C-alpha cells in the first residue's frame, strides 16, 4: 500500500533536495573554478574574466609543472611516501589501539598510556627538537624521514580504540574458547570486522602524507629529495630566471601565479579523487555497521 504524503512532507522533500543541490554546488564549484583558472590565459586571469569556464584556453601552467625533469622524481617519492607511510601508520595505529581497547583486567593501567598519547597529541616538543632528532638518526634526505616523522597519529588511535571497544565481546570469548590468543583475535576477528574503520583511517593517512610539504622542506637538503608537494611549492614560490633559457623565460612571462597555483592544487587533488571511489563503499558500511539487523 502506497501512503499518500501530506503537503508538508512534499514541501520538506523539495526543500531537502534544493538544500542538497546547493551543498553539492558549494563543494564542486571551487574545484571547477580552480580547474578553469589553471587552463586560462594570463590576461584573462589578471582581468578577472574567469568564472564558470576557461578563458583563453591553454595548458602552459601544466606544461611548466610537468616540463621540469625533477617533477616525475618528486612524484615517485610522494607515491613511495604514501604507500610506505600508510602501511607503517596503520600497523602502529592497530598495534596501539587494540591493547588500549581491552578491559582493565586484560590491560591494567591502560588509562596511563592513553593519557600519555593524548598529552603528546596536545603538546609536542616543537619543530627544532624534532629536526635535531631526525638529523641525529640520519633521516635527512631519506624516504624514511618523510614517513616516520608522522608515523603515528593519536587521533587515528582514538578512533580505532573506540571502534574496537564496540565489537561484541562474545566474539573474543569464542576465539579464546577455540584456543586462539590475542594475536589471532586481532588478525582473524577484529581487523576483518574493522574494514570500514581501517579504510577510513587509511584514507585520512594517505591524504595527510600526500598533502604534507613542510617536512620535505625541513628534511630535504637537495631538490632531488623533495616530495611532490614540496617541489611544487618551491617551484611556485622561487621562480629562478637565472637557470632558464630565452624560450623558458618567454613562456614564464605568459603565466600567471594564480594559474600556476591552481594547476598545483588540481594536480594535488587527482590522486585523492582517484582513490576515494574505491574506498567509498567502506564509508557506507561504516555508517550501517552499528544498525539493528533483523
Segments from the language model and where they lie:
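A hydrophobic, multi-pass inner-membrane permease signature
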Residues: 2-294
Amino acid at each position: 500500500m502506497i501512503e499518500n504524503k501530506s503537503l508538508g512532507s512534499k514541501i520538506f522533500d523539495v526543500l531537502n533536495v534544493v538544500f542538497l543541490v546547493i551543498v553539492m554546488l558549494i563543494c564542486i564549484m571551487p574545484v571547477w573554478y580552480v580547474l578553469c583558472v589553471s587552463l586560462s590565459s594570463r590576461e584573462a586571469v589578471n582581468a578577472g574574466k574567469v568564472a564558470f569556464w576557461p578563458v583563453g584556453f591553454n595548458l602552459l601552467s601544466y606544461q611548466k609543472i610537468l616540463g621540469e625533469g625533477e617533477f616525475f622524481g618528486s612524484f615517485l617519492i610522494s607515491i613511495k611516501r604514501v604507500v610506505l607511510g600508510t602501511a607503517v601508520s596503520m600497523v602502529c595505529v592497530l598495534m596501539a589501539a587494540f591493547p588500549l581497547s581491552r578491559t582493565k583486567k586484560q590491560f591494567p593501567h591502560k588509562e596511563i598510556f592513553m593519557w600519555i598519547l593524548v598529552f603528546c597529541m596536545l603538546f609536542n616538543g616543537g619543530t627544532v627538537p624534532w629536526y635535531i632528532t631526525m638529523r641525529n638518526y640520519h633521516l635527512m634526505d631519506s624516504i624514511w624521514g618523510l614517513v616516520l616523522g608522522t608515523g603515528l597519529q593519536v587521533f587515528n588511535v582514538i578512533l580505532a580504540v573506540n571502534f574496537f571497544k564496540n565489537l561484541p565481546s562474545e566474539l573474543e570469548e569464542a576465539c579464546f574458547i577455540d584456543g586462539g590468543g590475542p594475536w589471532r583475535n586481532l588478525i582473524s576477528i577484529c581487523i576483518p570486522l574493522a574494514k570500514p574503520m581501517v579504510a577510513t583511517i587509511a584514507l585520512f593517512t594517505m591524504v595527510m602524507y600526500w598533502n604534507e610539504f613542510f617536512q620535505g622542506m625541513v628534511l630535504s637538503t637537495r631538490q632531488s629529495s623533495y616530495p611532490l608537494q614540496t617541489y611544487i611549492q618551491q617551484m611556485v614560490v622561487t621562480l629562478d630566471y637565472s637557470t632558464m633559457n630565452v624560450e623558458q623565460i618567454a613562456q614564464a612571462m605568459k603565466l600567471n601565479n594564480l594559474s600556476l597555483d591552481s594547476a598545483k592544487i588540481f594536480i594535488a587533488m587527482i590522486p585523492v579523487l582517484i582513490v576515494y571511489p574505491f574506498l567509498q563503499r567502506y564509508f557506507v558500511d561504516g555508517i550501517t555497521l552499528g544498525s539493528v539487523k533483523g
